[in-house]
Amino acid sequence: MKFNFVVGAAVLVLAGSAAAQEGGKTISKTTISLGTATPGGGFPLYGNAFAEVLNEADATILIEPRNTKGSNENIPLLEAGGLDIALVAGEPSYEAFMGIGRSPIRLKILTAMYSSPGMFVVRADSPYKTIRDLVGKPVAFGAKGSGLPILSRYTLDGIGLKQDEDFQSIYLDRAGDGPAMVLDGRAAALWGAGIGWPGFKSVAEGPGGARFIAPTAEEIAKIKAKHSFLKPLTVPAGSYPGQNEAINALGSWSFVLTRENLPDDTAYRLARTLHGVEAALCKKLPQACETTAANTVAAAPNVELIHPGVLKYFREIGVVK
């Protein structure tokens, strides 16, 4: 996979020091650039909450969220040193760590963000009830640089469907453009993932409500057999307006990744601050309730992929031996 990107001077505010006054004392701040994704999606929502809660909790760090094109831009930006930390969806992370279509990355995991069960949303008054009902129809699969189209590609491949041949695939410039396309009929469905995902919420809050389409139990078994890294996940009842029953789906965990050379002490401070305010982050953003030390250890493909500074903190609190 070849990545083309431009790193502008404005992006290159890396983990460096700045000074601030508090109570008459000069406090040295470490500025940390955080790559998110295009406006209107789940990553900017999470990234802004993450930065706000951590900045409030620790006066010595200043996390600055930046909109990017998403996971597929965040990875090369981290590799080039254009970002300190960035949000990356599970499937691009998996491919990059495993060296699928490229050489393996040397980036590290700061934390698991949240699980991302993938599914489609359609208008409640539409005739579509199953994934195969959507074959041949215009479907918005997410923003061009995001991880969502990768998750959908694996999901559909598991049941013998090709994303760009069996559907009229639509790839968005901005994640926030998808819901309007479903509501006005330009798209039959919108693919997305997660609990509290903005796109699903927007369609569900539309005039006629929404219906969600996920793989059937038989389809889930087929997908798991072909792509075992995808895990069974559940969207609890009531996660979206009008969703009265739990939805079983498949997906993976999104991560906050760090550049390879992020200093150990910076990663340690970030981990200590983050996991000290898990409750505050959860209160700020429901999907961030899954951002815990225990989930990070469980979700990491290999514990050695977790940043050494984070591992030091995890050993101190007993989640890693």
What is the predicted role of each segment?
Residues 31-57, 61, 116-184, 279, ...:
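Bilobed "Venus flytrap"/periplasmic-binding protein-like clamshell domains
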